[in-house]
Amino acid sequence: MEHLERCAWVLRGTLVRAAVRRYLPWALAASMLAGSLLKELSPLPESYLSNKRNVLNVYFVKVAWAWTFCLLLPFIALTNYHLTGKAGLVLRRLSTLLVGTAIWYVCTAIFSNVEHYTGSCYQSPALEGVRNEPLSKQQCHGQGGFWHGFDISGHSFLLTFCALMIVEEMAVLHEVKTDRSHCLHVAITALVVALGFLTFIWVWMFLCTAVYFHNLSQKVFGTLFGLLGWYGTYGFWYLKSFSPGLPPQSCSSNLKQDSYKR
């Protein structure tokens, strides 16, 4: 338990700062551009991380929203109820996860449709021999073809959105004080460690996407969708009264605190 608490203390000191919430979006955008330029001008040699079958990609990134949802749900419920003691307010705050799910679903559907309507089925990876019959991506692959369209980077979108959402929700830790002997302390500490490591995985894999996968325009659009999803909620809508609201900063039920305003 001592090691877990020490790890949680380090992660809190790293991710809960207001400066992190303020500058992380800019850092992600800048690293995406820098990584993309590196990929175009001086590609890195292939490595384990450039293989789409690597463990982090298969078991974490491909289900990034599921990981984020499942860890934020108990974290938001426990911390918000601890601070406010109001079940209704906790349910209201938990609706941020429904909003996030809707953003994830709509954006991925948009990306899929863009790739479909801009794509064609080819007979080889060299994009030779276009098949003229109307095919979907799935039908193309099923017939041994190769689909090529404008593939907006879903990883750039989702990893940006998930990392920023976790950092926003962890800001509540400024106010959370629990008795070390209480089971709530153990639960929150474990969730802090899990969410902290998850955030670092998302940022690291975002950087790997920048230097290994997609072209610049695909990553720009993906990252832009992630930033818009974050800012449209935490930077705009959640500041309004008719919204899930921001994480509480004090024991009052007021969710609109100045330190969260940008």
Curated annotation (Swiss-Prot):
Its EC number is 3.6.1.-. Residues 1-23, 79-93, 167-185, 240-262 are cytoplasmic. The active site is at 155, 214. One of its GO terms (molecular function) is coenzyme A diphosphatase activity. It is found in: Endoplasmic reticulum membrane. Residues 45-57, 115-145, 207-218 are lumenal. GO terms for biological process: cytoskeleton organization; fat cell differentiation; fatty-acyl-CoA catabolic process; intracellular triglyceride homeostasis; lipid droplet formation; lipid droplet organization; lipid homeostasis; lipid storage. It catalyses: an acyl-CoA + H2O = an acyl-4'-phosphopantetheine + adenosine 3',5'-bisphosphate + 2 H(+); (9Z)-octadecenoyl-CoA + H2O = S-(9Z-octadecenoyl)-4'-phosphopantetheine + adenosine 3',5'-bisphosphate + 2 H(+); (5Z,8Z,11Z,14Z)-eicosatetraenoyl-CoA + H2O = S-(5Z,8Z,11Z,14Z-eicosatetraenoyl)-4'-phosphopantetheine + adenosine 3',5'-bisphosphate + 2 H(+); hexadecanoyl-CoA + H2O = S-hexadecanoyl-4'-phosphopantetheine + adenosine 3',5'-bisphosphate + 2 H(+). It comes from the Eukaryota. Keywords: Endoplasmic reticulum, Hydrolase, Lipid metabolism, Membrane, Transmembrane, Transmembrane helix. GO terms for cellular component: endoplasmic reticulum membrane. It is an enzyme of class 3 (hydrolase). It is a multi-pass membrane protein. Signal peptide: none annotated. The chain crosses the membrane at residues 24-44, 58-78, 94-114, 146-166, 186-206, 219-239. Fatty acyl-coenzyme A (CoA) diphosphatase that hydrolyzes fatty acyl-CoA to yield acyl-4'-phosphopantetheine and adenosine 3',5'-bisphosphate. Preferentially hydrolyzes unsaturated long-chain acyl-CoA substrates such as oleoyl-CoA/(9Z)-octadecenoyl-CoA and arachidonoyl-CoA/(5Z,8Z,11Z,14Z)-eicosatetraenoyl-CoA in the endoplasmic reticulum (ER) lumen. This catalytic activity is required for maintaining ER structure and for lipid droplets (LDs) biogenesis, which are lipid storage organelles involved in maintaining lipid and energy homeostasis. HAMAP family: FITM2. Belongs to the FIT family. FIT2 subfamily. This is Acyl-coenzyme A diphosphatase FITM2. It comes from Sus scrofa (Pig). The lineage of its organism: Eukaryota, Metazoa, Chordata, Craniata, Vertebrata.
